[in-house]
C-alpha cells in the first residue's frame, strides 16, 4: 500500500491537482505458466471465451484501480488510464468438480478470502481515505457499485458510475 500511496499522490498532484478525480477499476488476467508461481489459479479468460463456450486460463487475476487522465499535454486527443492501486485476486481452490464429475468436499469458507468486487471496494476506500477533501467519480463494473453503495467508501463525495 505504501507504493500505491506514493504513486497515487505523485500522479494526482501532476494530473489532477484540483477538482474532480476520475478513477476506474477493473480486473485483468495475466497468463502465467508453472504450478509453483505464487497466487496463480484457473480464472475465466474473456479474450478466448465466447458466450457459448466460457474458457479459463492459468494465471494471476489482478484488480487494478487507475487514474483517468483526459488529454494530457503529450497526447491531447487521448485518454490515459494510469494504475495507482492493485490487489491480487486468489480464487478458492478445490471447490470445483474434478475430472470424474464428483463434487469436491466443501471446506469452510476462508474468512480472509475476498472477491473481486470486495477488493475493488477496498482499493476505492483506500484511495478515498488518502484524499478525504477531494471528489471522486469512479467507473466500475456493476457489482462493485452495489457493494460500494452498501458499504459507503470513506469519502462522502464519491460518485459511482458504470462505464466511462
List PLM regions with ranges.
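Conserved, well-structured functional cores that handle cations and Mg-NTP chemistry
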Residues: 1-164
Amino acid at each position: 500500500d505504501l507504493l500505491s500511496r506514493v504513486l497515487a499522490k505523485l500522479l494526482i498532484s501532476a494530473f489532477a491537482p484540483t477538482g474532480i478525480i476520475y478513477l476506474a477499476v477493473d480486473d485483468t488476467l495475466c497468463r502465467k505458466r508453472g504450478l509453483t508461481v505464487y497466487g496463480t489459479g484457473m480464472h475465466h479468460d474473456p479474450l478466448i471465451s465466447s458466450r457459448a463456450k466460457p474458457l479459463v486460463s492459468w494465471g494471476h487475476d489482478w484488480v487494478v484501480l487507475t487514474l483517468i487522465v483526459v488529454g494530457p499535454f503529450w497526447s491531447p486527443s487521448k485518454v490515459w488510464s494510469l494504475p495507482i492501486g492493485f490487489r491480487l485476486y486468489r480464487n478458492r481452490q478445490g471447490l470445483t468438480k474434478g475430472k470424474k464429475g464428483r463434487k469436491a468436499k466443501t471446506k469452510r469458507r476462508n474468512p480472509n478470502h475476498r472477491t473481486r468486487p470486495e477488493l475493488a471496494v477496498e482499493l476505492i476506500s483506500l484511495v478515498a481515505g488518502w484524499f478525504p477533501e477531494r471528489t471522486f467519480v469512479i467507473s466500475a463494473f456493476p457489482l462493485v457499485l452495489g457493494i460500494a453503495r452498501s458499504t459507503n467508501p470513506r469519502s462522502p463525495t464519491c460518485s459511482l458510475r458504470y462505464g466511462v
